[in-house]
Amino acid sequence: MYGAGGGRAKAERKGGVKEEAGPGGTGTGGNRVELLVFGYACKLFRDDERALAQEQGQHLIPWMGDHKILIDRYDGRGHLHDLSAYDAEYATWNRDYQLSEEEARVEALCDEERYLALHTDLLEEEARQEEEYKRLSEALAEDGNYSAVGFTYGSDYYDPSEPTEEEEPSKQREKSEAENLEENEEPFIAPLGLSVPSDVELPPTAKMHAIIERTANFVCKQGAQFEIMLKAKQARNSQFDFLRFDHYLNPYYKFIQKAMKEGRYTVLAESKSEEKKKSGPTSDNEEEDDEEDGSYLHPSLFASKKSSRLEELMKPLKVVDPDHPLAALVRKAQADSSAPAPPTADGTPAQPSQVEYTADSTVAAMYYSYYMLPDGTYCLAPPPPGIDVATYYSTLPAGVTVSSSPGVTTTVPPPPGTTPPPPPTTAESSSGVTSTTTTTSALAPVAIIPPPPDIQPVIDKLAEYVARNGLKFETSVRAKNDQRFEFLQPWHQYNAYYEFKKQFFLQKEGGGSTQAASTAEEAPTETAVEESSEAGEDGAPEGMAETGGRGSGKKEAGSSKSTVDGKLVKASFAPISFAIKAKENDLLPLEKNRVKLDDDSEEDEESRECQESTSSVANPSPAAAPPSAVVEEKKPQLTQEELEAKQAKQKLEDRLAAAAREKLAQASKESKEKQLQAERKRKAALFLQTLKNPLPDAEVGKLEESTFGVEETGVMPCPLLVGGRTLPMLEGKPPERPSSRCRDPPREEEREKKKKKHKKRSRTRSRSPKYHSSSKPRSRSHSKAKHSLPSAYRTVRRSRSRSRSPRRRAHSPERRREDRSVPTAYRMSGSPGVSRKRTRSRSPHEKKKKRRSRSRTKAKARSQSTSPSKQAAQRPSAHSAHSASISPVESRGSSQERSRGVSQEKDGQISSAIVSSVQSKITQDLMAKVRAMLAASKNLQTSAS
């Protein structure tokens, strides 16, 4: 293919060259560009096997024995056979030098910054932060009037008549600079009041002293951690070398700092500025008047200010820590000098002596720990930096209410313009908290000064944006060095307020979801523990009643969750439990493992459940009794170690119980599948046999009796072991009658139940598709059994239903007894749909029995054509072998008397016969499942032994 193309290209090239050279006389005369292409013929051989091997990677070999990394023979990594020399585990510096926790944390942060570009799009992140910054600026501009540009009518305002800065002679500036240089470079002389030790070296110049003085003052106010921050930031600045311990001026800096903390030192820079202020007004009064006259403007020409209630409320209230030793020393010095105490920020006089201060510490702490929020409410100040939140708030008096979040504890605000209320007198006497001068108060707390109204919206907006977008947005805003956002610097006076608002918005953003999640997690465990402990003391019904009274959510969790600490607790349902809609996943293990004997009436069933619950409380198994006793005894006095040990034990028991449940479920599933296959084969054979040669009714009865006999032999007494607890035995005989106390429910409930039965029966008779309506309360797992009958088979059964129904009465009491010996949970199957139905109404098995009895009585009436009086006389004898209570018989009799006049009686008899045949097959299904579960439990018991 290449050969032909190459020849064509050569021909074109030659022709093109000739054409170009022909008309123009030169090679460059035409527009065509010369192209030289060579082509060679090539044969391709198709090798499918090698291509397939290449695709499957058969030519690749594992690199250094690692099958995850496959290389071919041309890969350069094949030359690397030993990486131990380059392994980071052996060759890094960290092997010799162990990092502390803080250093490891910093190193991890550095690694995150190093490799940030691997998993983050930095350009997109920067664009997003820029967008957020623009939004913040727009939001601030919307709130304020042209607040993007600070417009002032001062001396800096441009005036055309005045000379500009370039034209202005710079003599005055030179003079001021020279004066400053002279002041800064003059040698430092220690003031008279400061007695510096002889071994401490003084700074050479006044400028150096001023830097040391201001640094010491800042560290005294802000706390010792700011000294570390300053040292890190100013590491390259030679003027701050005195912060290093080996510097010759460090002892002088420490001496000044100590003197400031003890109150023996006054700042020289402040005193100088005060002197200038005092001397200034006397000399410059006339000049100021002239300036005022020159720059006077009518108030209407000024920019409009926001007039809001905030201006009245927002008064700068400085928070002073009364427990600080410096404040105590100042008060003591003032009391010793017997000078009148200066009023504080709000005009309240300071405490005159140390004794009064200690006695009144709760009042002072209550007063000074408040500060006003923008909405007029008062709020507790957040703890100073470097102090643990728990220890800080535990030292506060008991009158101060403290919430879990630092600095967001709002109290009832006093009316605006008044001071916060003092604490009640009872709080001081009831709490054992005295005045605390703890070690944590050695660090001076940050004075949270609410900003003025023009700055406060900016701080609030930025704090809200940072809480929403994260701390990276704050660092990006801080890096822009915008004058409006100077409060982001830690040395700024409004930084503490900004930090407080940021924490407030952070908690507002993330507090609700975590709180809801924590309450949702705590609720079921609390109710379950309470239920188990109460069941150990007073029996299960009382525990159910107590937990039920605590709220609908807790009642639901308490009734449905009976697995506490990994042990399967026997669920003793009180009559109220039938009105509770239980969760599907919670009831599944209960339905599998609860073994109760059932009778035909609901009252007997409830009384038997009561009897079983009392017997299980009276004779508990040894595996489950000790934990409940431990909970009873050690509930009031559980230490931290005991709690941890108990939690570890509970986790271990949880794992063991979960493993046992999984094994049981797996075994039951496997055996269930095998049993189901065998049952399907047997049913298919029976069905084909009935289609080929229909059996007479007596033979069908014998067949069904034989199947039930086989199932009865399979039901052996076998205890189920789940979670270290034995459940009651299965027995083939019907149970004894329980006590009359539990047997007799109120008569009103009986009447309501009768009414419900009559309504349901009349509803099922009035519908035309009887087959579907009668089998509705069954679970979804039996839908195949319901619909497996073809239409031809249904018609055959319908034609024979009249003659069969009287004869089948012969073996029906036996089947009823056999059904009675099967537990309710197994008869219903373990599906959640069935369990839900059971909680609302009677079990499907009882409905099944009632429908059978109804169809039999109707068929009897049709075949024998007896009078109503005879039929009424024969009815008690027909039901005497089956029912123990009188109310079901009466209800059946009354329902039959009402339904005699119904026009659709014939259709009802036919459909009831079909339903009874389908029900017999479903009952066989259920018995097969029971056998499978029992076989699985036997296998589990033998493997455990």
From Swiss-Prot:
GO BP field: alternative mRNA splicing, via spliceosome; mRNA 5'-splice site recognition; negative regulation of mRNA splicing, via spliceosome
Bias kind Low complexity: ranges: 335-352, 426-438, 514-527, 615-630, 871-894, 909-920
Start-end of each SURP motif repeat: 211-253, 458-498
Sections of the chain in a coiled coil: 632-686
Basic and acidic residues compositional bias, start-end: 9-21, 169-178, 589-598, 643-679, 733-752, 811-821, 895-908
A molecular-function term among this protein's GO annotations: RNA binding
Region (Disordered): 1-28, 157-190, 269-298, 332-355, 403-438, 512-566, 589-680, 714-921
Positions of modified residues (Phosphoserine): 283, 601, 621, 829, 831, 899, 903
One annotated Gene Ontology cellular component of this protein: nucleus
InterPro entries, per database record: Surp, SWAP, SWAP/Surp_sf, SWAP_N_domain
Keyword Nuclease part of the UniProt annotation: no
Location of this chain's protein in the cell: Nucleus
Disulfide bond residue pairs: none
Keyword annotations from UniProtKB, A to Z: Acetylation, Coiled coil, mRNA processing, mRNA splicing, Nucleus, Phosphoprotein, Repeat, Repressor, RNA-binding, Transcription, Transcription regulation
Modified residues (Phosphothreonine): 639
Biased composition range(s): Acidic residues: 284-294, 528-540
Chain positions found as N6-acetyllysine: 315
Compositionally biased residues, Pro residues: 412-425
Gene3D superfamilies xrefs: Surp module
Comp. bias regions, Basic residues: 753-787, 795-810, 835-861
Described function: Plays a role as an alternative splicing regulator. Regulate its own expression at the level of RNA processing. Also regulates the splicing of fibronectin and CD45 genes. May act, at least in part, by interaction with other R/S-containing splicing factors. Represses the splicing of MAPT/Tau exon 10.
Protein name, per record: Splicing factor, suppressor of white-apricot homolog
Lineage, uppermost ranks: Eukaryota, Metazoa, Chordata, Craniata, Vertebrata
